[in-house]
């Protein structure tokens, strides 16, 4: 995929509040400045719904990485951190995987991780992670809401943050899908 806008044209947000972990994604698939689909599912669950994955970037590349992560999760008995590190090593060292244009947020009860195309595994300090073109908008909104709106649930914060991101990012929309880590 040669168009950089298509690479980052989405919003994925994950946050943890009061032991509740929510991951949310918009539904828009864009290529350049064209909307191809508005109801895409960018979230997947694995390990009996104990791990949720959201991806941004090329859809095919995101699905390929999801499949690789699923294999690692099975290989390492649902140990998310170990599986993510092993996937990142493969991603960095494999000639084919290095060309994949995608990022992922993965979460279980213990960890929220961002996996980048450079082979990075990043665990955010404040229990909020976001990727994609609308990621910084969603991240900023979630941080503000977490700080000043103590009465909101994780799900309410995620929905409000995603809607703010969709208002500001032309490559994201208001068709928000959310999953809760069980």
Swiss-Prot record:
Tell me which Pfam families the record gives.
Answer: Proteasome
Location(s), subcellular: Cytoplasm
Highest taxon of source: Bacteria
Instruction: Identify a single GO molecular function assigned to this protein.
Output: threonine-type endopeptidase activity
- Residues that coordinate or bind Na(+): 166, 169, 172
GO CC annotations, alphabetized: HslUV protease complex; proteasome core complex
Active-site residues? 10
Q: Name one GO biological process term.
A: proteolysis involved in protein catabolic process
* Regulation of activity: Allosterically activated by HslU binding.
Tell me which UniProt keywords the record has, alphabetically.
Allosteric enzyme, Cytoplasm, Hydrolase, Metal-binding, Protease, Sodium, Threonine protease
Reaction it catalyzes: ATP-dependent cleavage of peptide bonds with broad specificity
Q: Do the record's keywords include Protease? A: yes
InterPro entries, sorted: ATP-dep_Prtase_HsIV_su, Ntn_hydrolases_N, Proteasome_sua/b, Proteasome_suB-type
Complex and partners: A double ring-shaped homohexamer of HslV is capped on each side by a ring-shaped HslU homohexamer. The assembly of the HslU/HslV complex is dependent on binding of ATP.
Tell me, what does this protein do in biology? Protease subunit of a proteasome-like degradation complex believed to be a general protein degrading machinery.
Q: Indicate the family of this protein.
A: Belongs to the peptidase T1B family. HslV subfamily.
State what protein this is by name: ATP-dependent protease subunit HslV
Gene designation per UniProt:
hslV
